Amino acid sequence: VIMAEPAAGLLSNEDCQRYSSVYVKRIIDAVQDDSFAVILHNCGNTGHCTAAMLATGAKGYHFGNKADMITALRECPSDVWVMGNLDPVGVFRVLTPEDVFARTEELLTCTGEYANFIISTGCDTPPEVPFDNIQAFYLAVEKYNKGRCLSIPVAEVVSDGH
C-alpha cells in the first residue's frame, strides 16, 4: 500500500519526525511484514527530510519531482525501494511525447546503477495528461530495459520451491 504524507515535506526534518514519522512508523510496524509492504510517499520532501522518512521503516519511499533522485538513492539503504520522480505536470501534462520519452530515458540513465530504483511520476498524474505521453513513458522504460540483465534473486522469483 502507498501511504501519502505530502504535507510532512513542508516541515523541517525534525518536525517531520516529531509530527509525522513517529505516527507513520506505528502504522508501518503494525501492518508491514514479509508479505505486505508499505511505501511512503512524500512529494513535499525536497531532500531536507529524507532521514525522517527513513525513520518510519517503510519498505519503499516515493519522492516528488523536486527531490534529487541521485541524492535520495544515496541516502536510502539499498534494500528498500526508491521511487520517483518525473514531474506529472511539467513533464507528463505539458511536454510532447518525444520530450516525455527523452526525460524518462534521462532519469533511467542517471539512476541505472541503483537496483532499488523504480521510475514513476513524482506525484499524482492529472487527468488531462495526453495518453500519448503515458505511452511514451512506457516505451522509454521498455527500450531502456530491453536487453538488460536484471539481477533478481531466485528466492524472489520462485517461492515454496515451485
Question: Regions from the language model: what does each represent?
Answer:
Residues V1-H162:
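Active-site loop segments of alpha/beta catalytic cores
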